[in-house]
Amino acid sequence: MKVLVYFQPSPKHDYFEGARMRKTIKGALEVINTAYTSNILDDYDVAHFMSPDDENKLNIVLERKIPVVVSALFGEADPSTRFLNYKSKDGKRITTIKPKALRMLNKADLILVPCKTGKEFLIANGVNKPIEVCVPGVNLSRFNFSREDEKELFYRYFREDKNKKLVVALGEYAYNLEGIHAVINAAVKRPEVTFYYVGDESFALTNRRSKKIIKNSPKNMHFIGIPTDDIYRSMLLNADVFMLPGYNYSGFISIEEAMASNCQLIVRKTAVCPEMFKNEKNAYIAEFSETLTSLCLDYLDEKIKPTIDEAYRKISLYSLENFGNELLNNYKALIARK
């Protein structure tokens, strides 16, 4: 068995959830001694794609009569691996599949999603190919808290005070930074705490409304693009709180990494898979920005109990070896059907 693991965006986009998912898949295959390649011209038994931008490459593989697998809904915070669109109609928020993503998914032989609700959503929105739930694995050794050299990277790079608590929020630099005030209001009320908002900032650079919000934020609230993998991991290892303030479904793989880093999760209800989390057990989940702000403040003030241990136990179930075996079983079943 040899697998094509394909995700090759432009270098400026090869650093976020898509790149980390590619590394995770390759790592899982290595653990179970399964060969892989990144060269589409090689010989292989099955091809695994993860970006709706790669439809042309998928077509090349299909012409060779090779089975195709597509991973979807694992990296929705990354523009390169985003399958969903959002719009408002009559005051209601509507989630749809990108037209090119839907077209690509319906060319695949098998689609892998991280949760049951994701599978149900794809089916309800026009995907007619087989879909399996396959939760991405996590290399827990990459989040080893005893590695002080990696923890130091964040402080050396951003020159922050080690004695201050750190809150990291992941989101999008969309039109008006929807949901961002859940974080900003917490930063206003806790000037002694350092806050970082992380996301793909290309849109914000040209958007006046986003730039105004950023400009008027308190000094302890920092807005950055996606840092390199080692620095981002160092941020997580030092973070007291990991927030998802946005309304959009967020990046599943980023949530897994926050769980593996022993961050306290404080997330918006619409941003996460409901079957993965239980409020007050392995995360704090809220629908409204005011509640998210209050939860963040209460946690920083030690008024509510951490759910970190239960979150870590949950993510520990999804090892690279388990993920690799699940991938291999799906590949073999697909080849047998073909």
Descriptions of predicted regions:
Residues 76, 91-111:
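Membrane-proximal helix-turn-helix segments that form the acceptor-binding/catalytic region
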Residues 104-130, 138-142, 179:
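A short, active-site helix/loop in glycosyltransferases that binds the activated sugar's phosphate group
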Residues 208-227:
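Nucleotide-activated donor-binding/catalytic signature segment of Leloir-type glycosyltransferases, i.e.
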Residues 160-178, 184-187:
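Conserved donor-binding/catalytic core segment of Leloir-type glycosyltransferases
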Residues 264-267:
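Short hydrophobic beta-strand element within catalytic cores of glycosyltransferases
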Residues 279-290, 297-304:
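Conserved acidic donor-binding segment of nucleotide-sugar-dependent glycosyltransferases
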Residues 247:
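Aromatic "clamp/platform" in nucleotide-sugar-dependent glycosyltransferases that forms part
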Residues 170, 194-209, 225:
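Glycosyltransferase donor-sugar binding loop
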